[in-house]
């Protein structure tokens, strides 16, 4: 199947520009052997390349390109399929934008085309060419430094509850996972994540439960989360708990129960965040919305967890605006390498900024992911790069320090 792949990257500062023609000559021979053709644009600092050919060969060559130390900030913009090649003259043809007038350069690029139809802007792949040549999207291109530009040093602040303080009859426990602002070295909140024992009643598969049992167990388990938060002496830190959306609907006294447990553990509603997962079906939305009103009227904040991973997404956001959203790890992973993920996350940030909704990123695992997200405007993060969730305690936090 004929595959089209487009990426952009940044040449290393210490890489001689004069060697680019030699590099292209080698790539041309290699690509032709794999039945891959394409064109490489260069503007003095950035590469923009289109590859066309059999899917496996294109992806094999792209993997090799990603390992090439002569460039960095490699971002895949497009991987699509087409009936015919657009640029089929050579395995790799270099087009130096610096040698052409700005007004003429696009037509000069199109003149390189080999399609039997004249290349036009209706072609999605060629719209990427226009954007690169005219530099109309520079504000969305973030040049992040190498991953080894930062050290992450644990602060030794971990704490664990004495096992004697935990009742042996308790079936569920909680792990606490911090949400942090790394550059200001500030803890935003601790998320209490339930850890279920295999023999726990609340660990029984949903299909094996009696009607309503899952929601009762979901609600009642939060009493332990508040008890542990109090025992860990989290002070005035925000505490985030997770609820199934339908728990608020099926448990009529859910809000009163939460408020009573918050008070019993010397906490205040204003430091509590209730998270709902976007992917859960909210079949009785009006009743859910009424329960949300009660939560917010009591001072409790509301967040959508795993935003972007479910099917409700923007429709849910149009009907219900939380105080916070947490962008799903599925969108965060390798965001520094993926043009589509970058565009989606930037759109989420812009939308939430317009609605004054705070945004955090979850599942951040690498320095590159964090640096790109910081550049995009996100300040709050959760993930193993900074700290892993700690069972019955709070973990040390690895704060970034510039080398």
From Swiss-Prot:
SMART domains: BLUF, EAL. Residues 155-403 form the EAL domain. Disruption phenotype: Reduces expression of ycgZ in the presence but not the absence of BluR. At 16 degrees Celsius, reduces expression of genes (including ycgZ) for several small proteins. While the BluR/F system is induced at low temperatures under blue light irradiation, it is not essential for growth under these conditions. Residues 2-93 form the BLUF domain. GO terms for biological process: regulation of single-species biofilm formation; response to blue light. It comes from the Bacteria. Keywords: Chromophore, FAD, Flavoprotein, Photoreceptor protein, Receptor, Sensory transduction. GO terms for molecular function: blue light photoreceptor activity; cyclic-guanylate-specific phosphodiesterase activity; DNA-binding transcription factor binding; FAD binding; flavin adenine dinucleotide binding. Signal peptide: none annotated. InterPro entries: Acylphosphatase-like_dom_sf (IPR036046), BLUF_domain (IPR007024), Cyclic-di-GMP_PDE-like (IPR050706), EAL_dom (IPR001633), EAL_sf (IPR035919). One of its GO terms (cellular component) is plasma membrane. Gene3D superfamilies: 3.30.70.100, EAL domain. Binds 1 FAD per subunit, non-covalently bound to the BLUF domain. Pfam families: BLUF, EAL. Its cofactor is FAD. The keyword Flavoprotein applies. Residues 98-144 are annotated as: Joining helix. Induction: Expression is strongly activated by cold shock (over 30-fold at 16 degrees Celsius compared to 37 degrees) at low temperature in a PNPase-dependent fashion. Repressed by RpoS. The joining helix is required for stability of the light-adapted state. Monomer, it undergoes transient dimerization following photoexcitation or upon temperature reduction, with a relaxation time of about 2 minutes. The dimer may be the inactive state. Interacts with the N- and C-terminal domains of BluR. Can also interact with the C-terminal domain of MlrA. Binds to and releases the BluR repressor from its bound DNA target in a blue light-dependent (470 nm) fashion. A shift to low temperature also triggers a BluF-mediated relief of repression by BluR, suggesting BluF may serve as a thermometer. Blue light may act to increase the affinity of BluF for BluR, allowing it to be released from its operator. The protein has a reversible photocycle, and undergoes structural changes, probably in the EAL domain, in response to light. This is Blue light- and temperature-regulated antirepressor BluF. The lineage of its organism: Bacteria, Pseudomonadati, Pseudomonadota, Gammaproteobacteria, Enterobacterales.
């Amino acid at each position: 199947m004929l595959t089209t792949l487009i990426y952009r990257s940044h040449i290393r500062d210490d890489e001689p520009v004069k060697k680019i023609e030699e590099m292209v000559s080698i790539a041309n021979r290699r690509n032709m052997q794999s039945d891959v053709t394409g064109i490489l644009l260069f503007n003095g600092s950035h590469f923009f390349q289109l590859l066309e050919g059999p899917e496996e060969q294109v992806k094999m060559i792209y993997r090799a390109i990603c390992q090439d130390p002569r460039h960095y900030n490699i971002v895949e913009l497009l991987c699509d399929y087409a009936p015919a090649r657009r640029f089929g003259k050579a395995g790799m043809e270099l087009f130096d934008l610096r040698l052409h007038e700005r007004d003429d350069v696009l037509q000069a690029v199109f003149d390189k085309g080999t399609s039997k139809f004249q290349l036009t802007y209706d072609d999605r792949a060629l719209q990427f060419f226009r954007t690169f040549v005219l530099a109309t999207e520079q504000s969305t291109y973030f040049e992040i430094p190498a991953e080894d530009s930062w050290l992450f040093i644990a602060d030794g602040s971990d704490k664990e509850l004495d096992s004697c303080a935990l009742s042996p009859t308790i079936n569920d426990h909680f792990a606490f996972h911090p949400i942090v602002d790394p550059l200001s070295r500030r803890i935003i909140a601790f998320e209490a994540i339930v850890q279920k024992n295999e023999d726990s009643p609340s660990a029984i598969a949903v299909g094996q439960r009696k009607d309503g049992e899952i929601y009762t167990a979901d609600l009642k388990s939060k009493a332990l989360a508040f008890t542990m938060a109090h025992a860990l002496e989290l002070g005035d830190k925000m505490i985030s708990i997770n609820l199934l959306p339908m728990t608020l609907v099926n448990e009529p006294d859910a809000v009163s129960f939460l408020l009573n447990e918050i008070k019993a553990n010397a906490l205040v509603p204003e430091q509590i965040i209730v998270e709902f997962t976007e992917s859960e079906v909210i079949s009785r939305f009006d009743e859910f919305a009424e329960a949300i009103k009660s939560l917010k009227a009591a001072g409790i904040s509301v967040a959508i967890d795993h935003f972007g991973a479910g099917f409700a997404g923007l429709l849910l956001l149009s009907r219900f605006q939380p105080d916070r959203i947490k962008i799903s790890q599925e969108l965060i992973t390798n965001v520094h390498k993926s043009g589509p993920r970058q565009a989606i996350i930037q759109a989420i940030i812009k939308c939430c900024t317009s609605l004054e909704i705070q945004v955090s990123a979850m599942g951040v695992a690498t320095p590159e992911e964090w640096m790109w997200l910081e550049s995009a405007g996100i300040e709050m993060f959760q993930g193993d790069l900074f700290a892993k969730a700690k069972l019955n305690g709070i973990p040390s936090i690895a704060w970034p320090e510039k080398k």
